[in-house]
């Protein structure tokens, strides 16, 4: 990845990190998960850092330092697109979603396979999914996040890049809050911290996506 792109990917993450320091894949139709993030008090520094992280509007277009990196990305994109075809039949829509997810997950320091697994469990890859708790979109982001760290417009959570950006930033926040403990962070993301059912579902889904070339 080029220096400029890498700087953009890492710069926003450093801001909120600094603040926080004080088998084969089977895609099945699932209802949106009923669990949801819980609104918790945020220190002003954390709120500001998270707001800066979601506000950066750099386009999700990857740049690579070498031909090998670019070829690896293209192989991943092709394999992921093929696996996602049953859920997203239109090729341009599928590719745009995957390109955006790859960018936003890498930007937040997350594995694309983990984010794909979370989206699979949370929404079944449905852009306009709404849970019983009111969580929205691919990553089932609760509307209060738009008020806490966004511009207050919760309808934007149905926009692909906005939803994936918020979801990735929130998961990164929970990971940092839990000292890197993925099970606890995933539980917190779903509003079921300390229980294993939801994290195990996400990690199981991640294994399928991790097998991509």
Regions found by a protein language model. Name each.
Residues 25-27, 132:
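Sterically constrained small-residue positions within well-ordered secondary structures
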Residues 9-12, 27-48, 52:
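C-terminal segment of N-terminal export signals and the immediately downstream linker at the start
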Residues 2-24:
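N-terminal secretory signal peptides and thylakoid transit peptides that target proteins
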Residues 5, 34, 61-65:
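Charged, low-complexity surface segments at secondary-structure and domain boundaries
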Residues 56-213:
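Catalytic glycan-binding domains that act on GlcNAc-containing polysaccharides
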């Amino acid at each position: 990845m080029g220096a400029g792109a890498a700087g953009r990917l890492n710069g926003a993450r450093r801001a909120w990190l600094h603040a926080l320091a004080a088998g084969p894949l089977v895609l099945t139709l699932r209802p949106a998960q009923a669990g949801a993030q819980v609104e918790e008090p945020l220190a002003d520094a954390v709120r500001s850092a998270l707001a800066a992280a979601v506000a950066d509007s750099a386009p999700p277009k990857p740049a690579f330092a070498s031909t090998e990196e670019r070829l690896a990305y293209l192989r991943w994109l092709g394999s992921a697109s093929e696996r996602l075809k049953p859920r997203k039949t239109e090729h341009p829509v599928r590719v745009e979603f995957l390109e955006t997810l790859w960018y936003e997950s890498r930007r937040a320091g997350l594995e694309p396979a983990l984010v794909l697994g979370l989206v699979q469990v949370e929404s079944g890859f449905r852009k306009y999914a709404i849970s019983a708790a009111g969580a929205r979109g691919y990553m089932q982001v609760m509307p209060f996040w738009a008020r806490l760290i966004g511009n207050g417009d919760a309808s934007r959570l149905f926009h692909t890049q906005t939803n994936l950006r918020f979801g990735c930033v929130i998961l990164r926040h929970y990971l940092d809050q839990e000292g890197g403990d993925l099970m606890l962070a995933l539980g917190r993301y779903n509003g079921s911290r300390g229980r294993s059912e939801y994290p195990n579902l996400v990690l199981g889904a991640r294994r399928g996506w991790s097998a991509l070339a």
